[in-house]
Regions:
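Noncatalytic, solvent-exposed loop/strand surfaces
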Residues: 15-417
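Bacterial N-terminal signal peptides
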Residues: 2-13
Length: 417
């Protein structure tokens, strides 16, 4: 069954030339495209570049001929931009409200948009959630902070919405600067109305309730479960009702009150890997009920990341930590295949992407290391663009899209399938 699910996952990824959400078509950071660029610089192998007004942690979202960007236009205003992927020209801009501010590394443009090819949904760190069509016509808008209270995260809200079929799934896990409860909600994507909203209580204290992760889905037989990490726990929820089905603990064994989680869970089949604040990183099998800490925990590893979300093809799992130390693990067992291996020194906030048999990972200085996605460590290239980078690379039709503080770069030549 697991092999069949993995085959289905890989086939669906291969058919997708779009990058419709933060971690790509299957929420795993994987593209099955081939013949992608390996080398570039500020002047080499750049098809076009578009000036950006400010940095962001949001990833470019791509559908056919259009790119969608969450943009902090200045110290106050936020906007959703639509860009022509053929030449980098801005097609339209739609306001996403005011209230932008700097929160440590972040500003309020950090959540990535999502699209189904007919509509685009954009969420900001100020709580504005808006649906527009591909021409920018507004379908609906909500102000989540106005409805449910201010987001209380120490570093500002940064979780992206999860789009699945007819619904958006949004988490607000916080506690550092608020006494309001954390919650998860499902919205009808066409109306913006709640299907459900459930609170998600934990025993986490001070900053530990804060989670900057994005939800994912784990498949159990013919059904799917919503997986949320944060507040020192991992939880699985029923898609229809939001009811918590299972909970795994052990992510904060020392009871550190500043144990916020940034790196998101990644799932293939019924197995989900959940990073925390470096250690421990754990894998759980979906489908349990109640406390699954012992019954469904598959493995534990103490060499996880803090900020970059790991990437997997369902067989191997590649991890790059904040200091540029890389590991390769067996996805199913957690056994280390290789590592620690040093890539270019620096601070890493972007997440690695797997494509064309290669891992692409960019540090905050704009250096993208390309290393082979295999059970043997081999650096293939180091590509330098001297600019500040928090955003992860997006892949579409043979091209790479890298967003820096000053520019959005389109790298390589397009090859339509």
């Amino acid at each position: 069954m697991r092999l069949g699910l993995l085959s289905l996952f890989m086939c669906s990824t291969m058919l997708a030339a779009d990058w419709p959400q933060w971690r790509g078509p299957e929420r795993t950071g994987v593209s099955a495209e081939t013949n992608l660029p390996t080398k570039w610089s500020e002047t080499e192998n750049i098809t076009w570049k578009l000036a950006m007004p400010m940095w962001t942690g949001a990833t470019p979202i791509i559908w056919r001929e259009k790119i969608f960007l969450n943009v902090a236009e200045d110290e106050d205003k936020l906007a959703l931009w639509c860009v022509d992927r053929s030449n980098g020209n801005v097609i339209w801009k739609r306001p996403m409200g005011s209230g932008n501010r700097k929160a440590r590394k972040q500003n309020m443009s950090s959540p990535s948009p999502v699209t189904d090819g007919k509509y685009v949904w954009a969420l900001t760190g100020t709580g504005i959630l808006k649906a527009v069509d591909m021409d920018g016509k507004e379908l609906w808008m909500r102000d989540i902070q106005k409805e449910y209270g201010r987001f209380g995260l120490n570093h500002g809200y940064a979780s992206s919405a999860l789009l699945h079929e007819d619904s958006l799934y949004i988490q607000v896990l916080h506690g550092m600067t608020t006494d309001d409860p954390s919650y998860v909600m499902r919205l009808n994507k066409m109306t913006g109305k709640n299907v459900w909203r459930v609170e998600r209580p934990t025993d986490a204290q001070r900053e530990s309730p804060d989670s900057y992760t994005t939800p994912t889905l784990v498949r159990v037989g013919k059904s799917l479960e919503l997986v949320i990490t944060g507040g020192d726990v991992i939880t699985g929820h029923d898609l229809a009702t939001g009811k918590e089905l299972w909970r795994g603990t052990g992510f904060n064994p020392e009871g550190n009150q500043f144990h916020r989680i940034i790196a998101s869970p990644v799932a293939v089949g019924d197995l989900v890997v959940a990073p925390t604040r470096i250690r421990p990183m754990m894998a759980f099998r979906g489908g349990g009920r109640g406390d699954v800490t012992s019954s469904h925990r598959v493995w534990t590893n103490n060499n996880g990341p803090d900020v970059p979300t790991p990437v997997t093809d369902g067989k191997l799992l590649w991890v790059v930590n904040d200091r540029g130390i890389a590991y390769c693990l067996d996805f199913q067992t957690g056994k280390e295949v290789w590592g620690p291996e040093r890539i270019r020194a620096g601070t890493y906030s972007a997440s690695p992407v797997l494509a064309d048999g290669k891992i692409y990972i960019t540090n905050e200085d704009g250096v993208t290391t390309v290393f082979r996605a295999s059970d043997k460590f081999e650096v293939l290239a180091e590509n330098v663009i001297n600019d500040y980078v928090l955003s992860s690379i997006a892949v579409s039709d043979g091209q790479l899209f890298l967003r820096t503080q000053k520019f959005l770069y389109c790298i390589g030549q397009r090859r339509k399938k």
